[in-house]
Amino acid sequence: MKLTSLSKNANSTATAVTVSSIQKLPFLSLSETLPCPKSSRKPTFLPLRCRRRPKLDLLWGKFRVRASDAGVGSGSYSGGEEDGSQSSSLDQSPATSSESLKPRGPFPYSLSIALVLLSCGLVFSLITFVKGGPSSVLAAVAKSGFTAAFSLIFVSEIGDKTFFIAALLAMQYEKTLVLLGSMGALSLMTILSVVIGKIFQSVPAQFQTTLPIGEYAAIALLMFFGLKSIKDAWDLPPVEAKNGEETGIELGEYSEAEELVKEKASKKLTNPLEILWKSFSLVFFAEWGDRSMLATVALGAAQSPLGVASGAIAGHLVATVLAIMGGAFLANYISEKLVGYVGGALFLVFAAATFFGVF
């Protein structure tokens, strides 16, 4: 028994010595004294960080999780770069996808109206052509007053005061706003002129007479403006003054329009409604009492009001678009004498056509 107990004590003592020696080996104790890097104590998992996104992204099913820039061990710096590049690629991919999924803008309202009107005109022309042939189409257009109104208004407005007012305003403000304001004024003026002409046309019915007073008044007005346009063109000097200098007889239409715009629109406008109103008011009051207005009155008294109104508005539209797109450029090449002669000749031609019942 004593031998057994002694052997057990010896074994336990040897085990204790062995453990103590193992715990205190020289190289292990030396390793404990060496500085240990802090990166070895970092957790080996990558913490996740969520960013709150707008509701719009959540509706489209976009949810993004980005890992932090923390790395493990000696590769922490390169790992941060990889995470940064990954996050940048994640940042760029929703932008490109949102651009590809961006819906197209609505179809322009003014362009849709123009297409509808053009389609209606083509359908009407096709029906008339099928029923009566090409001659019926030309007769319908001629009798409606559209051709006469379009020709007279277009020639009268080229180089007119309202033409240059629209051109000068378009150089300062948005062209679309200037076009809308100018066409609003010209359309209203055209409708008023046609209504006045219709009133003159109804005068003979009130006096119970068969004498076409309205047509005679229209012929007189057309002849008056034709002769006046030719006389004004004759009185102009052969070489017009440039850069706003006076000719000794009168200021040109461009100079008058420039003075009017400087006086009435000297303050720079930023509100779209103010630009619309300024374009409307300047063109409306410049057009009031002009030869194109009185020519519309004369045509409205002698021909179909609807055809005259549509032709006059179409002529105003074409002339105003030309003024806005390149009126200042055309001002250097437009001859006021030539415009006066051509306009006067057209007035006389349509006066004779109205007298003989061609239109």
From Swiss-Prot:
Give a Pfam family name: GDT1
| InterPro entries cross-referenced by the UniProt entry | GDT1-like, GDT1-like_CS
Q: Name one GO cellular component term.
A: chloroplast
Gene Ontology MF annotations? calcium ion transmembrane transporter activity; manganese ion transmembrane transporter activity
Define the transit peptide region by residue numbers: 1-66
Lipid bilayer topology:
Multi-pass membrane protein
Endoplasmic reticulum as a keyword? no
Write out the GO biological process terms: calcium ion transmembrane transport; calcium-mediated signaling; manganese ion transmembrane transport
- Annotated signal peptide: none
Protein family according to the UniProt entry: Belongs to the GDT1 family.
* Role: Probable chloroplast-localized Mn(2+)/H(+) and/or Ca(2+)/H(+) antiporter regulating Ca(2+), Mn(2+) and pH homeostasis.
Q: What is this protein called?
A: Protein PAM71-homolog, chloroplastic
Protein source organism = Arabidopsis thaliana
